[in-house]
Amino acid sequence: EQLIKKDVKHKDKFAKKSECVRAAAAAFTGGDKS
Protein backbone atom coordinates (compact mmCIF):
# COMPACT_ATOMS: atom_id res chain seq x y z
CA GLU A 1 0.00 0.00 0.00
CA GLN A 2 2.95 2.30 0.56
CA LEU A 3 3.85 2.03 -3.12
CA ILE A 4 0.27 2.84 -4.11
CA LYS A 5 0.20 5.82 -1.75
CA LYS A 6 3.40 7.16 -3.30
CA ASP A 7 2.02 6.53 -6.80
CA VAL A 8 -1.20 8.36 -5.96
CA LYS A 9 0.78 11.35 -4.72
CA HIS A 10 2.64 11.42 -8.04
CA LYS A 11 -0.54 11.00 -10.08
CA ASP A 12 -2.13 13.86 -8.17
CA LYS A 13 0.18 16.14 -10.16
CA PHE A 14 -1.41 14.82 -13.34
CA ALA A 15 -4.95 14.51 -11.97
CA LYS A 16 -6.56 15.92 -15.11
CA LYS A 17 -4.47 13.73 -17.40
CA SER A 18 -5.22 10.67 -15.27
CA GLU A 19 -8.94 11.39 -15.49
CA CYS A 20 -8.78 11.58 -19.28
CA VAL A 21 -6.73 8.39 -19.45
CA ARG A 22 -9.06 6.56 -17.08
CA ALA A 23 -12.10 7.75 -19.04
CA ALA A 24 -10.52 6.58 -22.28
CA ALA A 25 -9.56 3.27 -20.69
CA ALA A 26 -13.08 2.83 -19.33
CA ALA A 27 -14.55 3.45 -22.77
CA PHE A 28 -11.96 1.16 -24.38
CA THR A 29 -12.69 -1.67 -21.94
CA GLY A 30 -16.41 -1.00 -22.24
CA GLY A 31 -16.55 0.16 -18.63
CA ASP A 32 -15.50 -3.28 -17.41
CA LYS A 33 -13.05 -1.70 -14.95
CA SER A 34 -14.28 0.87 -12.45
From Swiss-Prot:
Record bears the keyword Ion transport: no
A GO CC term attached to the entry: extracellular region
Residues annotated as transmembrane: none
Tissue: Expressed by the venom gland.
Places the protein is found: Secreted
Gene Ontology molecular functions: toxin activity
Membership in a protein family: Belongs to the scolopendra toxin 3 family.
Protein name in UniProt: Scolopendra 5848.48 Da toxin
Natural source organism: Scolopendra viridicornis nigra
Highest classification ranks of the organism: Eukaryota, Metazoa, Ecdysozoa, Arthropoda, Myriapoda
